[in-house]
């Protein structure tokens, strides 16, 4: 009906690919699956075959700056990259063009986010957006990235020092809950 050989059907709100299906002419959904999607709402996304061969890149941004990236790959015979379904991930270095694409996606979201994850797939035509995760994404944090996230959170929640306009110095532990 949409001119797609395969499509991904997802609930409008979900986590960890719960309730996500790969649709093709020979695959159908049970009546209970259709009822569930009708209740929660859903969306259809063109299936990008590169997910099976190259995986999906997650670009993590903390306090408006690119932090790190991971490549998520599905288990053999599956299309979902989440570990709950056998997917695996590894830290990677991404090309500047891919990082620039992620930054452009965040700029289009027109807000300063404390954290964000931009999921993309690299195709012969360039990177394409799969999802923009802003609510509660898995961030694949390293210790240094966790510190940047904590610093960003503190700078947004602590009152600025009246004289300097800067957040309080936390290096001495002063002002931190013990």
What does each of the following model-derived ranges do?
Residues 110-113, 122-178:
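C-terminal active-site "lid" helix and adjoining low-complexity regulatory extension at the edge
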């Amino acid at each position: 009906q949409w001119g797609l050989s395969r499509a991904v059907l997802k609930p409008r709100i979900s986590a960890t690919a719960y309730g996500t299906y790969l649709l093709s002419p020979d695959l159908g959904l049970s009546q209970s699956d259709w009822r569930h999607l009708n209740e929660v709402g859903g969306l259809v996304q063109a299936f990008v075959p590169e997910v099976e061969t190259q995986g999906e890149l997650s670009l993590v941004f903390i306090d408006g700056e690119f932090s790190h990236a991971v490549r998520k790959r599905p288990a053999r015979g599956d299309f979902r990259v989440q570990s709950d379904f056998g997917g695996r991930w590894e830290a990677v270095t991404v090309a500047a063009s891919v990082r620039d694409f992620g930054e452009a996606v965040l700029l289009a979201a027109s807000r300063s986010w404390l954290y964000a994850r931009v999921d993309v797939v690299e195709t012969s035509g360039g990177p394409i957006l799969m999802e923009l995760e802003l609510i509660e994404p898995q961030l694949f944090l390293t210790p240094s990235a966790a510190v940047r996230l904590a610093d960003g959170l503190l700078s947004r929640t602590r009152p600025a020092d009246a004289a300097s306009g800067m957040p309080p110095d936390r290096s001495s532990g002063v002002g931190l809950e013990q």
